[in-house]
Structure formats: C-alpha cells, structure tokens
C-alpha cells in the first residue's frame, strides 16, 4: 500500500512538501521514514504522521554534548537556538550518552531547525508506517 502526504509547516524540516510512503517497508539508515508520533505533545499530538530521516538504528551509540548530537562519534546535528528558546531549555539539558536498543530509531530532519529526535529521543520501530520518498 502507498500513502501520499503533504507537509504544510511554515518552515519544513525536509526539502520536499509532498511525500509518498510505502506502507510496511522497513526503516533503513539514511532513508526517509513515515511514522506516527507518540509522547511529544503538546508540540505534536499523538498519532501525527511525521516524515524524518533515519539517523541511527539499534546498536548505534548516541552522544549529545554541548549542543551537538553524535552518532558513533560522528557529528550529525546541532541544536537550534530558536528551538531551544521555544522549548525554554538550554542545550546542556539534553546532554547524555546511550546506545539504541532493539527496535529503536533516531530520526532527524534535514533542516537545522527541525524538531526531531535531538529533542525527544528515539522512536520505536512499532511507530513506523513505512519508508517515504520526497517527490515535490
């Protein structure tokens, strides 16, 4: 099955506005994935369909320090001062290190101002609807 979605945000986190999701396709590193949000309200209500890029999978080492997110010691993303201000948090509030467990994925947007796993942590593979592609 296939689903088509539209990103109507003022500032998108990915370079596309229209997406096609292949439901049931596995989430693979560096590919886009469509999933349903859980536990990140009030910013996004539970069940909101989101498309992000898989940045890390089970067994990958995550370290957040001084406003920078590292995956297996490779710098992947910086925290946005504007997002931190909106959340009323400082970058050091997110400092931590952990290893992704079975069924966990770290997802990021391509935009530096994306609201993603930098701020709310990993998602469960059970939230994944399928692989996504940006088409326009």
Please place each PLM-identified region on the residue numbering.
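Protein maturation boundaries and topogenic segments
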Residues: 1-50, 99, 118-136
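Solvent-exposed loop/turn segments at secondary-structure junctions
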Residues: 26, 40, 62, 69-70, ...
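Surface-exposed loops/turns
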Residues: 58, 101-102
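PP2C/PPM family metal-dependent serine/threonine protein phosphatase catalytic domain
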Residues: 72-93
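Active-site neighborhood of phospho(di)ester-bond hydrolases with catalytic His/Asp-centered motifs
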Residues: 105-110
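Long, low-complexity intrinsically disordered regions
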Residues: 111-112, 133
